[in-house]
Design a protein with these regions (language model features):
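Basic nucleic-acid-binding interfaces
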Residues: 1-20, 28-61
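Positions that flank functional sites
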Residues: 25
């Protein structure tokens, strides 16, 4: 999964961007009440386990 695809899913589920970092962005999920980091590495694929963990923290999966 690419970062852009992941961000679309996060926005659809109601998550919001909290802060930009140098290589990662900090997001907040109102469903879970958690803050979580999303890597911002251009058009590269995000590892499957990393994407699964981010989606779980966001309350999407």
């Amino acid at each position: 999964m690419k970062t852009s695809e992941l961000i679309k899913l996060l926005k659809k589920s109601g998550c919001r961007l909290v802060d930009h970092g140098k290589e990662h962005d900090k997001w907040y999920s109102p469903k879970t009440g958690k803050n979580f980091m999303v890597p911002r590495h251009g058009h590269k694929e995000i590892a499957t386990g990393t994407a699964r963990h981010i989606l779980r923290d966001a309350g999407v999966e």
